[in-house]
């Protein structure tokens, strides 16, 4: 266990609600300014109207705000929710959750979809949704422990800055030897110093014995997270089965899950090849349809597209089953093992790069005139480590490059 010293600002102990038909009927409310932790009811009318996920997020965000609130006001909330099917093993895509807030980029509401274990672990710990408001000094970590049935607001100074090192330390510290039971949300120094910050959602890949990541990338929600003084949010849970959600009709759920999984297993190899390639399969398709962003999307295709497409990354991806939730047959998460960055803080060290996804390849590759997969991997790695949205990074740099080419800047 990694030794860390923490000061407890607030603790709430609770009796965990059992999930019934996919719901706990409670949300968790953390106010960082007041240093308070509370729970609130989710009534039947709210469930029928908003269902879960984005709906619950918008309801909780609306309830927290006044009409003139800005993204960096303490009243702005970060809301995270799964849904009634969330956390169902072997049901494709059920590890997903939605993150919602006011965007520092648009000043309007933004939501971002993210995979991993946090959404399910939050629900199984007793809460259909999480709302975080207020602000605090830095180094704040919120811990939701569904096993010990307590929530802590901690001050932990001296934690690593980048998301990779931070998630490793917190997973090690809070896991009590069962790392697969921990999911960490974090941003990074890039999120704290720009308006294009992303959030990293971790899960522990037991087969590969390493912490892995998915990103809530769009809209600058990582910037909101950092502005609140949050270092991380940690969820802890244990075993999950088809019965954990206590579905209304377990046999019907099994039947539908088998049907979906069978179709995916049969059809995916002939169509999208998500389990083998992930979203990388889109590169040649978009190039053929003149839709591959190239040179700030002045063009839609490029002869070098094959250098950053399916053939290139199929050789680089770590082989074997992958995926960011238990038993998901889409299994679209992929990564590159033992990549060695050429630059930066990790120069010369072997790292595992989660991705790249198609949007990263297009945004930080062809859109910048880069047709080298290793350069794209390096950009991908450091954007994630520092909490920067790869799409925003790629499109911003591409815009500046075209401005320079046209003589608008020097």
Positions of the model-derived regions?
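Intrinsically disordered, low-complexity segments enriched in small residues
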Residues: 2-113, 117-410
């Amino acid at each position: 266990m990694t030794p860390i010293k923490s000061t407890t600002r607030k603790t709430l102990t609770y009796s965990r609600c059992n999930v019934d038909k996919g719901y706990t009927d409670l949300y968790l409310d953390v106010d960082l300014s007041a240093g308070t932790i509370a729970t609130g009811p989710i009534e039947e009318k709210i469930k029928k109207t908003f269902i879960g996920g984005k709906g619950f997020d918008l309801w909780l965000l609306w309830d927290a705000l006044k009409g003139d609130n800005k993204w960096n006001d303490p009243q702005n909330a970060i809301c995270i929710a799964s849904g009634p099917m969330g956390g169902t093993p072997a049901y494709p895509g059920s590890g997903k959750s939605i993150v919602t807030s006011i965007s520092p980029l648009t000043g309007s509401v933004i939501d971002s979809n993210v995979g991993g274990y946090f959404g399910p672990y939050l629900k199984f710990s007793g809460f259909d949704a999480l709302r975080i408001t207020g602000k605090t000094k830095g180094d704040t970590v919120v811990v939701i422990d569904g096993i010990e049935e307590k929530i802590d607001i901690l001050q932990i100074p001296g934690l690593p800055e980048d998301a990779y090192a931070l998630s490793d330390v917190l997973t090690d510290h809070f896991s009590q030897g069962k790392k697969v039971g921990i999911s960490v949300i974090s941003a990074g120094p890039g999120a704290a110093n720009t308006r294009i910050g992303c959030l990293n959602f971790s899960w522990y890949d037991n087969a590969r014995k390493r912490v892995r990541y998915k990103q809530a990338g769009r809209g600058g929600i990582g910037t909101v997270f950092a502005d609140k003084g949050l270092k991380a949010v940690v969820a802890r849970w244990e075993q999950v089965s088809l019965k954990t959600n206590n579905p209304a009709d377990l046999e019907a759920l099994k039947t539908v899950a088998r049907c979906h999984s069978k179709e995916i297993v049969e059809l995916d190899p002939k169509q999208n090849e998500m389990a083998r390639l992930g979203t990388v399969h889109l590169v040649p398709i978009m190039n053929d349809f003149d839709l591959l962003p190239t040179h700030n999307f002045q063009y839609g295709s490029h002869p070098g597209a094959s250098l950053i497409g399916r053939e290139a990354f199929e050789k680089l991806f770590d082989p074997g089953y992958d995926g960011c939730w238990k038993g998901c047959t889409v299994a679209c998460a992929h990564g590159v093992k033992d990549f060695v960055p050429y630059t930066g803080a990790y120069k010369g060290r072997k790292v595992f790069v989660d991705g790249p996804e198609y949007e990263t390849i297009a945004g930080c590759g062809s859109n910048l005139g880069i047709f080298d997969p290793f350069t794209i991997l390096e950009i991908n790695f450091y954007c994630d480590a520092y909490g920067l949205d790869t799409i925003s990074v790629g499109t911003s740099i591409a815009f500046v490059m075209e401005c320079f080419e046209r003589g608008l800047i020097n």
